[in-house]
């Protein structure tokens, strides 16, 4: 199941460069995750890298 970013996103940009599948991009007001591209960092890390760096803790399970 893919992750998604909630409205609590502060648009800081910390998550985007952490994504190994380039599933995260800047939306109009918050960052967004492309569910078709997100694999929760399987094969790259033990847990989702974006979740680990998000200061607003707004990246959650979809």
Swiss-Prot record:
[4Fe-4S] cluster 2 binds at residues 19, 38, 41, 50. Residues 2-28, 29-62 form the 4Fe-4S ferredoxin-type domain. It comes from Chlorobaculum tepidum (strain ATCC 49652 / DSM 12025 / NBRC 103806 / TLS) (Chlorobium tepidum). InterPro entries: 4Fe4S_Fe-S-bd, 4Fe4S_Fe_S_CS. Binds 2 [4Fe-4S] clusters. It comes from the Bacteria. Ferredoxins are iron-sulfur proteins that transfer electrons in a wide variety of metabolic reactions. Keywords: 4Fe-4S, Electron transport, Iron, Iron-sulfur, Metal-binding, Repeat, Transport. The lineage of its organism: Bacteria, Pseudomonadati, Chlorobiota, Chlorobiia, Chlorobiales. [4Fe-4S] cluster 1 binds at residues 9, 12, 15, 54. Pfam families: Fer4 (PF00037). The keyword S-adenosyl-L-methionine does not apply. GO terms for molecular function: 4 iron, 4 sulfur cluster binding; metal ion binding. This is Ferredoxin-1. Its cofactor is [4Fe-4S] cluster. Transmembrane segments: none annotated. SUPFAM superfamilies: 4Fe-4S ferredoxins (SSF54862). The keyword Heme does not apply.
